[in-house]
UniProtKB/Swiss-Prot annotation:
This is Elongation factor G. It is found in: Cytoplasm. The keyword DNA repair does not apply. GO terms for biological process: ribosome disassembly. Residues 9-296 form the tr-type G domain. It comes from Streptomyces griseus subsp. griseus (strain JCM 4626 / CBS 651.72 / NBRC 13350 / KCC S-0626 / ISP 5235). GO terms for molecular function: GTP binding; GTPase activity; translation elongation factor activity. The keyword GTP-binding applies. It comes from the Bacteria. Catalyzes the GTP-dependent ribosomal translocation step during translation elongation. During this step, the ribosome changes from the pre-translocational (PRE) to the post-translocational (POST) state as the newly formed A-site-bound peptidyl-tRNA and P-site-bound deacylated tRNA move to the P and E sites, respectively. Catalyzes the coordinated movement of the two tRNA molecules, the mRNA and conformational changes in the ribosome. PROSITE patterns: G_TR_1, G_TR_2. SUPFAM superfamilies: EF-G C-terminal domain-like, P-loop containing nucleoside triphosphate hydrolases, Ribosomal protein S5 domain 2-like, Translation proteins. GTP binds at residues 18-25, 86-90, 140-143.
Length: 709
């Protein structure tokens, strides 16, 4: 069994990210083929891609979970280890992208040569900026009709606000695309017809018809490099031509320094090709090794002291440092059970040893350690800093938690996961399905932090929440396939509330029942008033004096009032925000009892509530929409049409952010409407804010529906 201790300078932890259908998975497949991990090229459209290993992924032709894989690539005869994470591009799966970026050192952004910079490209670019991930770009699909490399480069400037350094030019276009011009070596890489799998290419002189264009773009490359690197600026000003080595070094320095922070522009080298037609992938691999960071290039990771959150602890990427790692993904393997993917930041990790989960303060034992290749695996005995591996045996660790040496505890910065934006009710079809549903929900929520579950006490339904309709569709599909749960999926119900708007100073109620033998008697006098502000949903005040009601019966009046509040008088929704004051009453030596006073309290409350101007309340959601400026008017108009109240507008990294309060009942279907109104370029998040009174005309409809009218 292997024990790995890698030369960290020769390791690259990268992600491949893009909009859905830009060709990420195909690009990854080609990388695996050329690096010798895969002996057959997997195609996404025939459902055979190695990285897309879930059944739903193969059916839908999209990547849902980030499969991690390790491969090797020699540059100048020196072997390099590349850990690749293939990320999904669909907006519903941004959590997968988010957690991948958290543990990567660099990224390859793939663009569709026909469509250019698409909406989800903007989203993942912003996510990469947030985590300060240096990246290189690959303009893919240049063999397609309508592909335009230079338009795509312009869109990188216009839509992403980045500075592209064009490294290659395409030779030929669409069906005649045959290779690329390399602007560093000023040579052409041409793929011959006979090498259908693109495993070899010829390095030749630049074709005559491209020499002028190549010279012009080479000048632009030198200019861009000089503007962003002091050493190159000196050479440039002296009129000296840099060597290839000097250029490579300068471009590496620029790429590593480009973190996409708020006060700086992301500078990114741009390459081109067609992964599907096997052209341009090897030079892209060279670029991954040449320009993207090794774990040594990334600053020491910072965490904080377990006992003192203000105290910062730094861990360098070295085997000699105490062990620290971040669990960034949980996956259920059909044969092995629960696998936890871990990025090792410092120290060594050995199979069979105990580590500390510093977030929970619990010890965990590492079972086996695996190096993953999509869904195949290789067992290793130990692993060092800078690596990404999967471990078995962790019982309590969930996504985003830190594992570390128990003698040197640290908590690394975790990941933020957005709250679910869409919810549906799910009902198992049988008792057996109910039990299986419990297991399925536990497993799926371990794997996916953006999948949340709660039981609605009012409707008795199990409500599942996620990042979008496709997200929930896939989760329900997995419940059926992997856990054999048969369930009906319905529409969620809004949990309305009821309250009162006016005080009622006195309600007298006498409960009297005589049926032979011991009767029932209880007399109460109460007052009701709304509780203004604050979070109190109910208060009970006892003002009875002189023993008019025996002390032991007073809690029964309180219990009766609370019972009545469970089902409001307008539409049967729970009542909130009421203060009940018990003023006076009377009792009978024989016939009074706790039950009698409970009934009296309940009936008096109902009578009073009818006179206290009852109203219906609805949950209001704090909604934040991030949109390109062109769609701002449409977004605001749409929110207003949903009874929304716009509260603020601001600018954020080139986009506009609209904040407002919108009733939850008006937000169903918003995901699809927003996408169609903004061509998919806007994103939104929402969370519960408060309850507010429902307008009378809307309330009348809700009440009629609740009463079955």
């Amino acid at each position: 069994m292997a024990t790995t201790s890698l030369d960290l300078a020769k390791v690259r932890n990268i992600g491949i990210m893009a909009h859905i259908d830009a060709g990420k998975t195909t690009t990854t497949e080609r990388i695996l083929f050329y690096t010798g991990v895969s002996y057959k090229i997997g195609e996404v459209h025939d459902g055979a891609a190695t990285m897309d290993w879930m059944e739903q992924e193969q059916e839908r032709g999209i990547t849902i979970t980030s499969a991690a894989t390790t491969c090797h690539w020699p540059l100048n005869d020196v072997d390099h280890t590349i850990n690749i994470i293939d990320t999904p591009g669909h907006v519903d799966f941004t959590v997968e992208v988010e957690r991948s970026l958290r543990v990567l050192d660099g990224a390859v952004t793939v663009f569709d040569g026909v469509a250019g910079v698409e909406p989800q490209s903007e989203t993942v670019w912003r996510q990469a900026d947030r985590y300060g991930v240096p990246r290189i770009c690959f303009v893919n699909k240049l063999d397609r009709t309508g592909a335009d490399f230079f338009r795509c480069v312009d869109m990188i400037v216009d839509r992403l606000g980045a500075t592209p350094i064009v490294m290659q030019l395409p030779i030929g276009a669409e069906a005649d695309f045959t290779g690329v011009v390399d602007l560093v070596s000023m040579k052409a890489f041409v793929y011959p017809e006979e090498a259908a799998k693109g495993e070899m290419y010829n390095v030749v002189d630049i074709p005559e018809n491209l020499q002028e264009s190549a010279a012009e773009w080479r000048g632009k490359l030198l200019e861009a490099v000089a503007e962003n690197d002091d050493a190159m600026m000196e050479l440039y000003l002296e009129g000296n031509e840099p060597t290839q080595e000097q250029l490579h070094d300068a471009i590496r320095r620029i790429t590593l320094a480009s973190k996409g922070s708020a006060d700086s522009v992301t500078v990114t080298p741009v390459f081109c090709g067609t992964a599907f037609k096997n052209k341009g992938v090897q030079p892209l691999l060279d670029a991954v090794v040449r320009y993207l960071p090794s774990p040594l290039d990334v600053e020491a990771i910072e965490g904080h002291d377990v006992k003192d959150p203000e105290k910062v602890i730094a861990r360098k990427p070295s085997d000699d440092e105490p062990f620290s790692g971040l669990a960034f993904k949980i996956a259920s393997d059909p044969h092995l059970g629960k696998l936890t993917f871990v990025r090792i930041y410092s120290g060594r990790l050995e199979a069979g040893t105990a580590v500390l989960n510093s977030v929970k303060g619990k010890k965990e034992r590492i079972g086996k350690i695996y190096r993953m290749h999509a869904n195949k695996r290789e067992e290793i005995a130990s692993v060092g800093a800078g690596d990404i591996i999967a471990v078995m045996g962790l019982k309590q660790t969930t996504t985003g938690e830190t594992l570390c040496d128990d003698k040197n505890p640290v908590i690394l910065e975790s990941m933020d996961f957005p709250a679910p934006v869409i919810q549906v009710a799910i009902e198992p079809k049988s008792k057996g399905d109910q039990e299986k549903l419990g297991v399925a929900i536990q497993r799926l929520s371990e794997e996916d932090p953006s999948f949340q579950v709660h039981s609605d006490e009012e409707t008795g339904q199990t409500i599942i929440g996620g990042m979008g309709e496709l997200h929930l569709e896939v989760l329900v599909d997995r419940m059926k396939r992997e856990f054999r749960v048969e369930a009906n999926v319905g529409k969620p119900q809004v949990a309305y509330r009821e309250t009162i708007r006016k005080a009622v100073e006195r309600i007298d109620y006498t409960h009297k029942k005589q049926t032979g033998g011991t009767g029932q008697f209880a007399k109460v006098q109460i007052a009701l008033e709304p509780i203004e502000g604050g979070d109190a949903s109910y208060e009970f005040v006892n003002k009875v004096t002189g023993g008019r009601i025996p002390r032991e019966y007073i809690p029964s009046v309180d219990a009766g009032a609370q019972e009545a509040m469970q089902f409001g008088i307008l539409a049967g929704y729970e009542m909130v925000g009421v203060r009940v004051t018990l003023l006076d009453g009377g009792y009978h030596e024989v016939d009074s009892s706790e039950l009698a006073f409970k009934i009296a309290g309940s009936q008096a409350f109902k009578e009073g509530a009818r006179k206290a101007s009852p109203v219906l309340l609805e949950p209001m959601m704090a909604v934040e929409v991030t949109t390109p400026e062109d769609y701002m008017g449409d977004v605001i108009g749409d929110l207003n049409s949903r009874r929304g109240q716009i509260q603020a507008m601001e600018e954020r990294s080139g986009a506009r952010v609209v904040k407002g309060l919108v009733p939850l009942s008006e937000m169903f279907g918003y995901v699809g409407d927003l996408r169609s109104k903004t061509s998919g370029r806007a994103s939104y998040s929402m969370q519960f804010d408060s309850y507010a009174e429902v307008p009378r005309n809307v309330a009348e409809e809700i009440i009629a529906k609740a009463k079955g009218e």
